[in-house]
Amino acid sequence: MSIQTTLNTGASAHFNKTFYDKKLLETAKTRLVHASFGQKRSIPEHQGKRVEFRRYELFTPDADKLTLEEGVTPDGQNLEQTHVEAEVRQYGAYIEVTDLLSKTAFDNVINDGAELLGEQLGTVIEWVTRDAMCAGTNVQYAGGKTNRLSLTSADKLTVADIRRAVRTLKKAKARMFTSSEDGRARKPHFICICSPDATYDLQSDALWQDVSKYAGAEQLYSGEIGRLFGVVFVESTEAKVFSQSVYTTVASHSANDDTVTLASMSDTAAAYLVPGAKLRIGTAEHTVKSADAANRTVTLSAAVSAAIPAGTAVYSEDAGALDDNKKGLDVHGTLVFGADAYGVIDVAEGGALRTIIKPCGSAGAADPLEQRSTVGAKVEAYTAAILNDLWIVRIEHAVTL
């Protein structure tokens, strides 16, 4: 991803382009793990916001059909393509600095602002990529379980889980990575992105090979921590964790009413409570018709004849096993994948992340007394999409607390 700094022509010498450019880059790159390994594509400007990936399918090997007869030209084969579309989006944020503050510590404010904004936008890019990667259906569950809700605290990530994921990728003929970030050749490998908690559980295994044991022999990825069975592990603090979206209680409900008032409704709960979502109230499952976050109400698809007592548990079943209080276990998602399993898509120069600094006076009539300056960061265009679902395995598991 290219990093640029846009500087207003009226800016003073305090705005050092190279310095702030470097500051934004350093902080953003600390967050870019998932976004580092995708197949990168750019889109030309003025060609719309939707981008189409074309993935060629492998030819089917058939010894009989491929046997040549002397002097006979065989029929040609047709290329088969799978099309994947994705839409780019822009992201951005800024902070405002008063002229009074600028007279005492303006450079420090710009420096700190660029650092904080770089980390914020870098994290957003990481989340967008991570969530796209975790939308796949090629899932395996630790401990031999068959679904997320059945995972318990005992179902931690093990070496056997990694071996199974590698087998899945090999059987799917997933391509292996053969070079490092700077293009230098290294041994063919798959990549695993995992949380520090998942790393903690794996490192206790005697088969774990710490990065210090081979660091001198190969060029490493940023954040690389070790390897197992041809898998290189890269750690991310933003690795996916599936937490229970709704966990609250009933505040009030009347008999024969389809609307329930909840004791609380978080932003996460509001995002989950869309039409058609499944919700447990006590032991009964209900379907959501609508939700009103401001009033903490949920309208169900059907009225409930008996009044639901206040204090009754209200919860979703989108995390791990429930405890006696209906609280779901946090489930971690560890990704093991091959090259070209997913793509990151941005505009002509790669969805540049850039700082935009506007000094006092640049706003004209909108700032008649020249009291305000701003420093912002903007992702010009970015998105991510899975290109081959069979080449990316999501292992869902518990972790040691």
Where do the model's predicted regions map?
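Extended, compositionally biased alpha-helical segments that mediate assembly or anchoring
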Residues: 2-8, 325, 340-341, 347-401
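N-terminal "assembly arms/tails" that initiate or stabilize quaternary assembly
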Residues: 1-86, 389-394, 398
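Long, compositionally biased low-complexity segments
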Residues: 222-245, 319-339, 343, 354-357, ...
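Autoprocessing Asn-cyclization modules and mimics
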Residues: 153-160, 208, 236, 240-312, ...
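Extended, solvent-exposed, turn-rich assembly/linker loops in the middle of proteins
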Residues: 139-225
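Cys-His-centered catalytic/binding microenvironment captured across papain-like cysteine peptidases
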Residues: 283-285, 299-341, 347-350
